[in-house]
């Protein structure tokens, strides 16, 4: 067809397009949208409802709807953005107001009940966890003893400031770390590993890797944490155990915004976060001002907290940042986030929300690529047919012989609603190589999950709860080459009849 013959066809196409005017329908899109270069006029059906324009001006009702949606969508994105700092702030709320521990004092956890408040806690190892307000303490000392420990110091956006223990610069040989507040100008004393925090508040978390519980408890007692100004006579660390129910994760409903407002007023605003602060300003959350939302703002924030969490759930389950670890498998790397959260041209907003909705903390040691060092985490939420794991159904997981871990491996079960260790009547939430599991003749293991134990397999069973979704982390501590080259592979969950 020649160019001359195309011209009448082009005129006909333009004429048909003009007849559609502002209400022309595009493909399979369910909404009528203005065509390019056509004015906004009349009634237009959109994703946020019907909008009306007169002389291109939105009607009063449309104006209110547009601004409400603008504020609402900004709040849902601020929810995803605020998850990491809201989680740490919530732990700090409990330590300061419920447990009333001294500033700089940490919590000690060992049993399942003591760990039930922590997002995706390791069920196998004891912990020391807590937060420190550097504005209150000034430079802060963490005296790490010699021994098998693994942990980190994170800022309040859950970015690692340093690893400590076997994967840290002390390499398990012990060291004194001195953490300074942002912009600290004081002298750096000798004998300390000095690190500056980008935030006024920090998190400290350490797990004891000793297999013997007595040795692990002894190692816990050797940690010392205190303000540098008290170094001549540091107070004795008590490291109390949690004395009440708590939640180390982002709270629900208005409590999320209350925690977020409170911590943002005690923190430095980074350049990368200024636009999110602008979104929060629309709904009554401002640095330097009290949080007194209007009835309209409160209703909007309540809805945004619910939808924001729904987005976090979907974003987490989709795990768009990672692919199946083995082709055709329902196992993915749980931590698909760079610990720095920074890529060449963007910061990892979705990836950060994906991990920190279901878990807490990051460190270089948690994303190790070095055999024999650190740890790795694989997550599975579905059976081999792609159906979500259901607490009312029973499953088998076949663990191939010689799991690739120098220290130990474990499979821990978590409630999908709370993202914490499953709180079952059995009072067991994990299986690991440190337990007396039934081993098959070829060295493999068959693990079982469901409301009731299969006869003769009780040692290898974790009880699930009908009405609750659940998922697992497969952890390898000091993973071996067989993990990294993928020569070792685990099966998917098989639903039992």
Which residues fall in each region the model found?
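A compositional/structural signature for long, glycine/proline-rich flexible linkers
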Residues: 23-497
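Bacterial N-terminal signal peptides
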Residues: 8-17
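Predominantly soluble domains enriched in secretory-pathway, periplasmic, or organellar proteins
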Residues: 20
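Alpha-helical and His/Cys-centered functional microenvironments
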Residues: 1, 13, 23
